[in-house]
C-alpha cells in the first residue's frame, strides 16, 4: 500500500489576535484543520467569524500570532518575506470579492502581473495572458480597462490573473458577493472546472448555497471551527512549492528595470495633472541651475576677456608703498623712472601716464567732463590700442608740448555728435584750443566697469604744462616682449626702482596675476549662483518626495494587489523609486531645455552668457540623484506595507 502523502495545508491550534484596540480581538481561536491536494473546500461563516482572516493567513498575506501553519510540510513561520512572496506568486492564486484590478492597466496587463514578478519574458507573459482570457471568454476585451468591464467580466479577469503562474491553490474570497446570480453561477462553474483539473480550491463565503458547490464545507463561528463535513481521500502531488511548472526562475524586478519603468510610466500617466506639478518643481530647479551657471560663466568670461584685451604681458607700476591703496597724490614716480624702465632688457613698450580726472572739455557750446591722460607716443603700443581715424602724436609733439589730442570713442561721440571723423577739429581744455589728430578704436569697459573709451590722450609734456602741473606720474605701463618672462621683468623693474628711490615706494603688478585673481573671484561668484539655483532644485526634490508620499497613500490598495500577486518588498521599492527617478529624469531634461532657452533670452537683453556642457550635465545628474534620494523614503514606506493591511485600504 502506497504511503499517504502529507496534507498540503495543515493548521494546528492556529491563533490570530489583533491588538489595535484597548481590548484585544481574537479573530482565530485555536483553529486546527488539514486540507489535502486537490480538495474543493468551502469555508463558511457570518461576518466576523474569522473566515477572511483565515484566508489571509493561508495565502501568506498575514501571519498568525500563535499555533502552527505547515504548507507542504514546511513551517510557514520559518520563511522570510522573500520566500513568502514566492509562495504568493507561484503557489497561490487569489480571487477577490472586489476583483482588485489595477484601474490604469488593461485586462491583459492585469492578468500578466504575477508573471512579471516571476521574471517571465514579455512575449511569454502576453501569450499566456491572452490564452487565459480567451479560455474565460474575455479574449475580445483583453485591451479593455476595468471601468469598461462589467462585474462578471472583471471577476473573470481576476480568475485569469490567479491562474497566470499555474498555482496549486486557488483562494477565492467571496468571489460571487458582488455579482448578479447569473454571473455568480458562471464564476462557481469556473472554480469547479479548476478543481476538476486537479487544483486545490478554497472558497470563502457566507452563503450556504454557494458553499454547497464544494466537496467539503468548514464552518467558522467566533474564530473557531464548528463544523467540518469531512475529508475526501488525499490526492497528493510532487510539485514543489514556490515555482510554477515550466516557468522561468524568479528573476525579480531588480533584473528588469525596463518593466519597472513601464509600470512607472503607466502610473504617472494615470494622473497627468499631479505628475505635471511634480515635474514643474524639478524643471524650475534644473532650469535655474543651467541659466544661472550660463550667466555666471558668461560674466566671468566677459571680465576675463576685458583683462586679456589689455594684454597678459603688461606690468602696471603705481606710486605708493605696497599694501597701501594709491591716493593719486603720491609723487614717487617720475618721467625719468619711465626712461630708466624703458632701457631694461625685454621691454617692448613703456608708457608713463599723468591722469587728471573730471576735466571739462568744450566745443561749440557742448561741455563734457572726462579724464585727460598725458602720456608718451608708445602708449598705443603699450596698451595694444589701434587707431580708428587719424594718427597718434609723435616724439616731435612730445618735445614741443604740442596742444594735440587723441580722443576715445566715448569722448568723440559726445563732443562731436553726428560727426563720423572729428580729426582736424578743435576743442578747448581750460580755454586752450587742442587739435584732434586721431580717434582710438572702441575698447569697452575695464573688468571693474570703468569706460576705457572715456578719455583724452595728450603729450605728457603738454599735460604737465597746461593741465595737471607738477612733474610726477600717476602710473607707468610696460609691455614685455615675452609673456613667459613677465615675472623676471617684474623683478627687474622692482630692483631698478628700489635702487633709484632708495626705498620701496611703488607697487608693481602684472596682468597675469590680476587675471588669476579675477578668475578666482568670478569662479566663486559663479559657484554662489549655482548654489542658489541648487536650492530651488532641492525644493523641487522635496516636492517630489511629498507627492510620492501622497501617491503611496492613495495607491495603498494597488501596493497590496502587487504584494498579493507575488511582488517582493524590493520590487515595490524599485517601482516607486523608478517613478521618482522617471519624474526627475524627465523634469531634468525639460529643465535643461528650458534653462538653455532662458539663457538665450537673457542674452538678448545684453547680459553676457556662455554655454558649457558641464552645468547642464551636472544639473541633470543632480535631478536624477534628487529622484533617487527623495524618492527613497516614499518607496521604502510603500515597500514596508503589510499585504493584508494594504489590501483592506479604501
Curated annotation (Swiss-Prot):
Molecular function GO terms recorded: ATP binding; ATP hydrolysis activity; transmembrane transporter activity
Annotated compartments: Cell inner membrane
CDD domains documented for this protein: ABC_MJ0796_LolCDE_FtsE
A single BP term in Gene Ontology: response to antibiotic
Cellular-component GO terms for this entry: plasma membrane
Entry's EC annotation: 7.6.2.-
Membrane topology (UniProt): Multi-pass membrane protein
Signal sequence, start to end: none
PROSITE patterns: ABC_TRANSPORTER_1 (PS00211), ABC_TRANSPORTER_2 (PS50893), MACB (PS51267)
Keyword annotations of the record: Antibiotic resistance, ATP-binding, Cell inner membrane, Cell membrane, Membrane, Nucleotide-binding, Translocase, Transmembrane, Transmembrane helix, Transport
Segments traversing the membrane: 276-296, 525-545, 580-600, 615-635
Residues reported in the UniProt entry to bind ATP: 45-52
Predominant place of localization: membrane
SUPFAM superfamilies: P-loop containing nucleoside triphosphate hydrolases (SSF52540)
Key word rRNA processing present: no
Domain ABC transporter: 9-248
SMART domains in the record: AAA
Subunit description: Homodimer.
Annotated function: Non-canonical ABC transporter that contains transmembrane domains (TMD), which form a pore in the inner membrane, and an ATP-binding domain (NBD), which is responsible for energy generation. Confers resistance against macrolides.
Family per record: Belongs to the ABC transporter superfamily. Macrolide exporter (TC 3.A.1.122) family.
Protein name per its UniProtKB record: Macrolide export ATP-binding/permease protein MacB
Gene (name only): macB
